[in-house]
């Protein structure tokens, strides 16, 4: 029996099925009309969600995209690593734009804090790795998660016990400063400055701190719908991605339950977001890659065109994204891991005007043909893509709002994607604005 059948609201999880940057922010914003609240459950301010509303561009890094909808309550769950400095910088940007933020934002008391020493370690490690760097954003996300797993992290609730916070901070800094100075060859982080700055955030945070898990339960019990907004993408998941070229958190749908404190049985529908092609930022294997700005051997002109037409630059880092054909074999892996109910395909219009379009449906790996992305980055790096080729279309799909209005060649391509991955495409995004969307099946009504 569904959650809605027993009087509870429906919960939709929106996750990326690629290497991030799939266009989740717009889709979350589009669906927020049907949700009482929007929840971030993992990651930190290392991923930007870009929204274009009424022609105005807004980039959100930490606060859920639902903040752009008046009256929607936004939640930051216990699975998020929180930089108070980044949070208030983002709040100020939004409030300057005329949005009411602090009265609509709830922050889990159990969220882990990102503090200056996490940032220092992140940057020092990448500098030490040199050419072998992973490509982190340098914002302290990974080191903060390390502290959480090591059970030494300072959490939001610790800010409200200054004496205990000071004692634990000193212990942490003794450890991290030793690592910074003796191993990484970097400068130590000042204890007193870190303490003073952190405690200064406490009174500003206090009105927003809540038992998020209990509040989410209450919203559902009253019949309210919730949306869980994933950051990054499945192929960057710390367990299921192309390890070690991954982020430091679980980006899969199952993380919504643990990272927000809700029962997994209350997740009603999983919406997987995928571009009509693939992109990746930073290092790591990418079987269907065509273009990499930093690699002279990867300068295919179709890939260059995808990057330029798709404006493929990181919204947080500004780094050029690597581009390639849609990898349906990798998408199939993501669909299985997440239990995806339906797909939303974004940026279809970027393919307009191509003479032909290729779809990766499998790989040749060590002399064998496989139809799903293998586990482990070494195996993925050895994969040679197996493509199916489709005729392109010259008609514009930009802003199209109905399936039947799409060019026949586009419909054929999309139907083949459905066949390969084994689930339906329920939504198609044909432009950055809210209304540039084709709806085939509504996640809250499915």
UniProtKB/Swiss-Prot annotation:
Provide the residue positions that the database annotates as binding Mg(2+): 21, 48
Check the record and name the SMART domains matching this protein: Adenylsucc_synt
Which reaction equations make up its catalytic activity? Answer: IMP + L-aspartate + GTP = N(6)-(1,2-dicarboxyethyl)-AMP + GDP + phosphate + 2 H(+)
Q: What is its EC number?
A: 6.3.4.4
**Which pathway is this protein engaged in?**
Purine metabolism; AMP biosynthesis via de novo pathway; AMP from IMP: step 1/2
Cite the active-site annotation. 21, 49
User: What EC class does the entry list?
Assistant: ligase
**Coiled-coil positions:** none
| The keyword Protein biosynthesis belongs to this UniProt entry's keyword annotation | no
The record's comment on cofactor binding reads: Binds 1 Mg(2+) ion per subunit.
Family according to the record: Belongs to the adenylosuccinate synthetase family.
**Per its record, how is this protein called by name?**
Adenylosuccinate synthetase 1
Species, as recorded: Cupriavidus pinatubonensis (strain JMP 134 / LMG 1197) (Cupriavidus necator (strain JMP 134))
